[in-house]
A protein has these predicted regions:
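Conserved G1/Walker A P-loop phosphate-binding module
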Residues: 3-94, 103-114
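Residue-level preference for short coil/turn positions at secondary-structure junctions
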Residues: 18, 31, 138-139, 184
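Extracellular structured ligand-interaction cores
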Residues: 19-21, 97, 111, 185-187, ...
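Surface-exposed acidic, glycine-flexible loop patches that form ligand/cofactor-binding
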Residues: 12-15, 107, 134-136, 177-182
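Active-site micro-motifs of SAM-dependent methyltransferase domains
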Residues: 41, 121, 196-197
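Conserved GTP-binding G-domain of TRAFAC-class P-loop NTPases and closely related GTPase folds
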Residues: 139-291
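Switch II of P-loop NTPase G domains
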Residues: 85-144, 151-158, 171
Length: 291
């Protein structure tokens, strides 16, 4: 889908082998595909009105997720109303992966091609795809670890186990040994998503969390992912890995409200309730930063 006319945008059929591969990792249903959709939407908006031309190939699930997120704001509602269907974002089924190619070029210049590989959460808990996983990691220059910020922060992290921190940690340590890789230098980005509530609190001068909330997210990630961060920044590995923490606003006008579950019961996606908030529209922020 070109953002410009056919004469400006590189033809989708002529997209060549990628120069950069980005791999998205995270637990099941944390929202990797939704984040990828918001990233694509944000970068499209940045490119609009410039001399950049974009084309993409594949990624129907990305299109579906983007359309679903926009649809949430088309129904009649008021600020603070509960959001219907917010938990039904597209998810990668079984051991499937989303393969999405993005071609970016200035007019009359050779395009740069980025390939996004969005792996299902099952990959990090199962060794049957080990060879395929190793191949994709080998080819990736950037690895994005998607984190559900609500699970990370609420109830003092009671439900953070659903972010599968230990599984993600072991997966990366087992599959990203610099000594065993040809393409050993990588950027590893921890990307907490669904930060709307915490971002609003952080910027509300009347809140007890004013200027504190976003820092608290970063601190919690450093605490929960300490083993992985220690591995990535160890004296032997730090020359290979560039590490960053980049919070993103996935939706903009929808934020976490409450859990509707009794203590002791298993938390399901439908137990996580969201509500409409300002700016009351699909307005992701900072999603283009990982790009």
């Amino acid at each position: 889908m070109g953002l410009f006319g056919k004469k400006d945008a590189p033809a989708v059929d002529k997209i060549i082998a990628p120069e950069i591969q980005v791999m998205l990792l995270g637990a099941r249903r944390v929202g990797k595909t939704s984040m990828l959709a918001s990233m694509y939407n944000s970068f499209s908006n940045v490119a609009a009105g410039t001399n950049l031309a974009m084309s993409k190939k594949g990624g129907k699930a990305v299109d579906d997720s983007l359309e679903h997120m926009k649809t949430l704001f088309r129904s009649s509602h008021m600020i603070n109303d509960a959001v219907p269907g917010v938990s039904d974002f597209s998810q990668t089924q079984g051991f499937d992966k989303i393969d999405f190619m993005l071609s970016i070029a200035r007019k009359k210049e050779k395009p740069r091609v980025i390939r996004f590989v969005d792996c299902s959460g099952e990959w990090i808990n199962n060794r049957t795809k080990e060879d395929e996983v190793g191949e994709e990691i080998e080819k990736s220059e950037v690895v994005i670890i998607a984190i559900d910020t609500v699970l990370l922060m609420e109830k003092n992290g009671r439900y953070n186990r659903l972010n599968a921190v230990q599984s993600v940690t072991e997966f990366i340590i087992n599959n990203m040994n610099p000594d065993a890789m040809v393409n050993s230098k990588k950027m590893v980005l921890f990307v907490p998503m669904k930060c709307e509530k915490y971002y609003h609190q952080n910027n509300d001068s009347g809140s007890i969390f004013y200027q504190k909330r976003m820092t608290a997210i970063v601190d919690r990630i450093k605490e929960e992912y300490a083993q992985l961060l220690n591995f990535l920044t160890s004296p032997n590995n730090k020359k290979y890995f560039t590490v960053g923490i980049l919070p993103v606003i996935t939706l903009g006008g929808i934020e976490f409200d409450e859990f509707t579950i009794d203590n002791g019961k298993e938390l399901l996606t439908e137990h996580i309730q969201y509500r409409y908030c300002e700016p009351d529209k699909f307005a992701p922020e900072f999603c283009d930063r990982p790009l």
